């Protein structure tokens, strides 16, 4: 008796790399942490600290700081490394800018960081909401500085840049995230050169000293590719750089290919400084808004 072809065998499940000791963090508790959570819940606000499973969430919350996530908690992109939910987002909340400013005032923030999901469903990519948030913050906290971490605003990055730079945030950040070769797998829907062009546009409008970019390490890049990306970011005009370790949010995301040691991060930070970056944060737990300040 003949039988049909057998189904191909599945490749064995790849065991995740063991997490090294330097990535283990102590989880604090107490009133500062509870207070930030209450403020977020009361205003129906979100933080990227929660949505992206940031390893520094407890440290930052305990210090009374947070990075606000605007335009909802559902992203229209499907980056292979990101923990933020993907799907069809809710309509833009018109009360969000006012609630965010209120929470920032109650927290007594001196430097407010705002980021967002990608909103490819919106004509302006959400740029108008960034502008409204900054305007509300200026009214509520006139002496606070502001930092925006923005998406690539496809298909109209120039219009978005003009709008956001018109209200002059203190820091303009956009993340290249990874090396050119890994973009198709890690950042489908995004283009490496477009992200560099956005940094250049911001540097032309605000000055490179105000422009920041971040890379996550451990997605499968080579050291030569990594150094090339650092050079590309500098050539684009950014003068602030953050380098941090990729931590896979789940087994459905791109697995960690390599853990970089603190010594390796220090060497990469020194390389970036040798190129002329003015402010470099480089370490396993560093993230885009880690120790954010003007």
Task: For the regions a language model picked out, list residue spans one by one.
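Local cysteine-cluster metal-coordination motifs and their immediate loop/turn environment
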Residues: 48-60, 71-86
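Conserved alpha-helical substructure of the radical SAM core
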Residues: 86-113
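Active-site mouth loops of central-metabolism enzymes
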Residues: 70, 81-94, 147-156, 216-223, ...
């Amino acid at each position: 008796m003949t039988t049909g072809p057998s189904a191909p065998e599945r490749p064995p499940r790849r065991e995740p790399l063991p997490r090294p000791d330097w990535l283990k963090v102590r989880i604090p508790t107490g009133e500062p942490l509870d207070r930030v959570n209450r403020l977020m819940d009361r205003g129906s606000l979100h933080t990227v600290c929660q949505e992206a499973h940031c390893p520094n969430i407890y440290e930052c919350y305990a210090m009374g700081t947070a990075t606000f996530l605007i335009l909802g908690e559902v992203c229209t992109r499907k980056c292979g490394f990101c923990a933020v939910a993907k799907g069809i987002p809710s309509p833009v909340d018109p009360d969000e800018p006012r609630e965010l400013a209120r929470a920032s005032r109650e927290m007594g923030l001196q430097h407010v960081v705002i980021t967002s999901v990608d909103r490819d469903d919106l004509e302006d990519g959400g740029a108008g909401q960034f502008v409204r948030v900054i305007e509300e913050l200026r009214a509520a906290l006139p002496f606070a500085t502001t930092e925006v971490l923005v998406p690539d605003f496809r298909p109209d990055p120039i219009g978005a840049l003009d709008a956001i730079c018109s209200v002059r945030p203190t820091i303009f950040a956009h993340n290249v995230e990874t090396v050119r070769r890994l973009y198709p797998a890690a950042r489908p829907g995004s283009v490496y050169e477009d992200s560099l062009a956005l940094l250049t546009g911001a540097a032309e409008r605000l000055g490179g000293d105000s422009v920041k970019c971040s890379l996550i390490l451990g997605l499968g890049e080579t050291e030569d590719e990594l150094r090339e990306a650092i050079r590309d970011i500098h050539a684009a005009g950014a003068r602030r750089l953050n380098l941090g370790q990729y931590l896979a949010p789940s087994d459905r995301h791109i697995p960690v290919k390599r853990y970089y040691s603190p010594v390796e991060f220090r060497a990469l930070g020194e390389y970036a400084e040798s190129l002329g970056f003015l402010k470099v944060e480089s370490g396993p737990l560093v993230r885009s808004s880690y120790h954010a300040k003007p």
